[in-house]
């Protein structure tokens, strides 16, 4: 059945509309997330960066001098300027050079009203001092733009999400009696990184046997415990690739464990019922309450001590969240990771997780929405 992807103006058009509404002539954003979001440039171990966007949407990217050539190749910016001098790690205050170079950009130097948002502490204030002008805080609009993903962002999230499932397969294959948790953890990282063909960002809970009741890091971190026959193995794997993130959780088994296998099946049913609640206008608070009720009624003596899920995109943990206090309504274009789990103290835990795209017609698992493969 064809999926109708959410349609909204591109994030640059939404940003330009905000600028017009407030009489802003240009906006300057600092930091890798902001830069990636607005001009598609992200680089492993990249230096401090910033982007200038004017009222017609022209984008000027500022990166370290030696990084300028690759930035011209990879970014969507109309112009790339390199700041500072040649070399790496020589200047201990590169932001000073970044700010100075931005202050010389024509639209910044000559503009009347500038908005700024910064992921680099203090860079916004330093720019204001350099240009001798008052700036408008653009943090709220940048946050709101990130909530709704454009189609190009969905594909970037999908790429990282698929890496998560390749890593999960490695966990499933490696969950054999005698294998150490850290060996399985490392196999997951290696599998995903080789598939990506570049360094990735990798976070993971990897717990086996009775350790699974400890839920997650930092309570239990993958170590030298040897997996035993019949052990459940819980893996929550989060991967960032090219600056966008995917998330997954699965409960694997070293052989057979009928009791926890049944628990996993029940959690998958709760995951599906939760998916059906991810509709425009719904809230994370409503979804969490129902998930918690289902977990506690299905598993007497079990608990759900963590959130029910969260959005993701440029980070692995974004608004909105499936928690009791989040009343932000869901909107088409939001991408949410949903992760029901249950934990029996001293015995075992289990968790499953998929990523969903909210559409006008409800939520669709991200791989299905974009025509990829199914679970696992």
Mark where each language-model region is.
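Active-site neighborhoods and metal-handling regions in enzymes and metal-associated proteins
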Residues: 1-376
């Amino acid at each position: 059945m064809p999926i109708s992807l959410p349609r909204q103006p591109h994030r640059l058009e939404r940003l330009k509309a905000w600028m017009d509404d407030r009489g802003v002539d240009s906006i300057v954003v600092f930091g890798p997330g902001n830069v990636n979001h607005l001009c598609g440039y992200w680089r492993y171990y990249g230096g401090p960066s910033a982007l200038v966007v004017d009222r017609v949407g022209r984008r000027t990217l500022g990166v370290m001098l030696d990084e300028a050539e690759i930035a011209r190749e990879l970014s969507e910016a109309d112009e790339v300027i390199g700041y500072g001098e040649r070399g790496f790690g020589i200047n201990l205050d590169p932001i000073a050079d970044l700010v100075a170079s931005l202050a010389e950009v024509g639209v910044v130097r000559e503009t009347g009203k500038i908005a700024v948002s910064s992921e680099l502490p203090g860079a916004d204030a330093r720019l204001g001092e350099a240009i001798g002008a008052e700036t408008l805080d653009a943090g709220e609009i940048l946050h709101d733009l990130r909530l709704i993903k454009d189609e190009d962002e969905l594909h970037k999230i999908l790429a990282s999400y698929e890496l998560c499932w390749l890593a999960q397969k490695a966990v499933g294959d490696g969950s054999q009696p005698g294998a150490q948790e850290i060996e399985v953890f490392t196999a997951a990282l290696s599998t995903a990184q080789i598939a990506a063909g570049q360094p990735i960002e990798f976070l993971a809970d990897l717990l086996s046997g009775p350790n699974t009741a400890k839920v997650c890091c930092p309570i239990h971190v993958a170590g030298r415990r040897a997996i035993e026959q019949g052990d459940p193995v819980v893996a929550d794997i989060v991967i960032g690739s090219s600056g966008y993130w995917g998330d997954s959780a699965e409960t694997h088994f070293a052989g057979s464990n009928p009791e926890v296998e049944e628990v996993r099946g029940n959690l998958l049913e709760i995951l599906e019922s939760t998916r059906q609640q991810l509709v425009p206008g719904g809230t994370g608070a409503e979804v969490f309450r129902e998930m918690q009720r289902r977990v506690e009624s299905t598993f007497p003596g079990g608990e759900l001590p963590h959130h029910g899920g969260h959005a993701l995109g440029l980070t692995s943990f974004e608004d909105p969240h499936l928690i009791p206090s989040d009343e932000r309504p869901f909107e088409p274009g939001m991408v949410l990771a949903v992760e029901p789990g249950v934990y029996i103290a001293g015995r075992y835990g289990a968790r499953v997780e998929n990523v969903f795209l909210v559409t006008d017609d409800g939520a669709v698992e991200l791989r299905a929405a974009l025509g990829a493969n199914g679970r696992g």
